[in-house]
Amino acid sequence: MSEKPKLVVIEGGKRDNELIDPKANGGTEIQARRVFSEFPDLVDKFNWVLSYPKIDLDPNKPSLLWMHETPFDQGIQQQFQKPDYWNQYTQIIFVSYWQQQMFHILYGVPYENSIVIQNSIDPILVSEKPKIDKNNPIKLIYASSPNRGLDILLNVVESEEFKDIDFELSVYSSFKLYNRKSNDIQFENLFDRCKKHEKIKYYGTRSNEEIKEAMSNSHIMTYPNSYAETSCITAMEAMSGGCLIVCPKYGALPETTSEFSWSYNFESDKMRHETIFKYVLMEAIKNYDQNNVKQMLKLQKVFCDTFYHWNTKLSIWEQMLTALHSQYNEDPQTPTPEAV
């Protein structure tokens, strides 16, 4: 029987004494903290790698790679271009089927060595949306890092076509969420534009609870994303919060929003993207109060609260971890994740 590959910290991963940065509150951290707190005993039976190895791995434990990053990330490319890198792991957990397929196509990761468990949220309570009339503008929201389309959004709402549209845009955006404050420097001009615009409220980084409350009090999530996301928790929260989502068909966004979003074909040309997004958003604002849109948003919430609910996904996590632990104990040299 062949010797099991040695588990090491791969070059490009960040060494740290803690698996999860205690000051970071991005999607990866939120998801990991929840799973780890729900099943501490099961979790402790494995080595965990959250996209990048951060701590030394115990060679006496099976290792799981929970991949949140895109296959195009430079550090990820460095890892997966090494022969049989993925063989170090008993199982690779992807957060979307789009992501799983891309890793298979680009790096040859076998489907039988991975599983998809989509990200999860707790449903958002929505009592009643704010009314829209001559004294109460339609409420738009952007809640993501600034590199995911904030520049396109600002160009649109500052355009001539939007001068006569009564709207209020709330912007929650900063790399402080990921404990990467220094990354904000290159986006300060965008933040300044937000602060100077009379129809925009800039909040920077706020707690996830505050973001969810903001979703429940907003009408449209404006998201002209130009970054190929592997999953979008913000979109899930917008769906549960009853927001109409305007976004491109790019990365895993079509999978996450599951045809409920007002989406459009992605354009790599920034000017074309901006133009298309502008007119789709204008149509969304114009038609938001239509009965068919309201019915769609109700169905959207039911879908999201059913399939992205933590209660739904936690049972899948428990089943997978239990099965993998049992299989590893039976034959630690040849784990069979395809049985999960």
Region spans (language model):
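A charged, aromatic-enriched C-terminal amphipathic alpha-helix characteristic of glycosyltransferases
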Residues: 25-30, 268, 272, 289-329
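Active-site proximal beta-strand in glycosyltransferases
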Residues: 47-76, 90-94, 115-118
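Carbohydrate-associated surface elements
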Residues: 98, 120
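Conserved donor-binding/catalytic core segment of Leloir-type glycosyltransferases
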Residues: 131-149, 154-157, 170
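Nucleotide-activated donor-binding/catalytic signature segment of Leloir-type glycosyltransferases, i.e.
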Residues: 184-206
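Acidic donor-binding loop of glycosyltransferase active sites
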Residues: 216-230, 243
